Amino acid sequence: MKKLPIIDLNNYQKQNNIAIDMCAACIIHNRKFGLRLKAIILSKAYFDILKKWAFDNYGEEFAESEWSLEGVEIRKETIWTGKTLLQEYFKNESVN
């Protein structure tokens, strides 16, 4: 899994790419509310947009099937519900 470099989510500037902007907005939103995001799952169409963006900006070494952004895994799956993005969270651990 490759880590996408040079993306500072504390001072995020839009990249003019809907896929990476959606992923960044999702991570920023979850951090704002203190939610522990494990993974972002993109539909095939949006993952292909992200893959093209990574290839154009970072070269062939980033033309992979999975990435991470700020510790959040980004991957492609078939989504049958018509949504473009799904979120997967870490399970809460009970304190005894």
Language-model segments: what does each one mean?
Residues 5-39:
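Extended, solvent-exposed, turn-rich assembly/linker loops in the middle of proteins
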Residues 32-96:
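Extended oligomerization regions of viral-like shell subunits
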